[in-house]
């Protein structure tokens, strides 16, 4: 475990220097990272092909392979994402408030970096670049531990970023990667109090549960996305169909994709055959309740477990509900607090849904797929938090900072 400890020591030392960098220095480094990604595309793709070959040989699912895959467009998108982070306002040093006390003390609250951020994530190489860019802009050092299936891709990306940062004289250790796939290394990282300030897991329920239960470092839990769309009796059904197809089919392997569809019983006879046909045309396997199967005969029977499941695939659980009360009760029981949507024309039902559904993002007449840092205007995101402390929802730059109080006096002492 010496490698992990040395990485953490370098990151801790680098974090002190990163906190003092100017916005201009950080932006130059980010632009250099983007340049290196574009100039070394073939090298990245070659390493990614090694990972893909192993994944296919290991019989991993098409959805998993889709998340693992890099191509020219995705690398260009990564580079553009880094440039977008460079364009974002620097949160470090922002003065959040200033007050003068009756005794003359001036008390200010200032935004500062978290310090050293550890990220344990599954096999999505884009997370490697997004996380490094965001942490750098927020003045943090970062230690990355990606999934073993993306090891070659991640190593290529981190090596290029290290070269880019070195050329801009950014401290060594600003971006580090655990260069082993050993679980022991990940477990050791989780216990590095005093070196890591926060640990962020990104991935499926199993990974997140492991980190939350075993880490002694403070954790920001990025959540499982068991997301729902509820179609009310007064909904515009054409709009509902567009939203459902987008939320389920556009990119099913991501956490903001819909996993369960809830339909009001009064529109079920008309809407379920319509949406069932559209979903089938998009290759979706439907698992429905008894009423659902009456109107979509080829739907499979849904189990209790299906309603708890984040499928991350072209599989959808469907349930017919009596009313808004039952829809909210279902979401409360089975939902993961990520993203929930209602399709309705009724303002009061929409308002009640937004007030009573406890989730990081609650939508009225829109797809859950918008729960994303770019779509919210934050730039790239470090993850989507489903907890309430220290952040909730898409975590951008500000969520990678904390605050401290700076107090100016003229010799005051406390009586």
Curated annotation (Swiss-Prot):
Cysteine pairings via disulfide bonds: none
Record keywords, A-Z: Amino-acid biosynthesis, Cytoplasm, NADP, Oxidoreductase, Proline biosynthesis
Compartment(s) where it occurs, according to its Swiss-Prot or TrEMBL record: Cytoplasm
Gene Ontology MF terms: glutamate-5-semialdehyde dehydrogenase activity; NADP binding
CDD domains recorded: ALDH_F18-19_ProA-GPR
Pathway: Amino-acid biosynthesis; L-proline biosynthesis; L-glutamate 5-semialdehyde from L-glutamate: step 2/2
Any single GO BP term: L-proline biosynthetic process
Pfam families in the cross-refs: Aldedh
GO cellular component: cytoplasm
EC assignment: 1.2.1.41
Chemical reaction(s) catalysed: L-glutamate 5-semialdehyde + phosphate + NADP(+) = L-glutamyl 5-phosphate + NADPH + H(+)
Main location: cytoplasm
Free-text function comment from the UniProt entry: Catalyzes the NADPH-dependent reduction of L-glutamate 5-phosphate into L-glutamate 5-semialdehyde and phosphate. The product spontaneously undergoes cyclization to form 1-pyrroline-5-carboxylate.
NCBIfam families assigned: PRK00197.1 (NF001221), proA (TIGR00407)
Family indicated by similarity: Belongs to the gamma-glutamyl phosphate reductase family.
Protein name, entry field: Gamma-glutamyl phosphate reductase
Organism: Carboxydothermus hydrogenoformans (strain ATCC BAA-161 / DSM 6008 / Z-2901)
Lineage: Bacteria, Bacillati, Bacillota, Clostridia, Thermoanaerobacterales
Gene name in the database record: proA
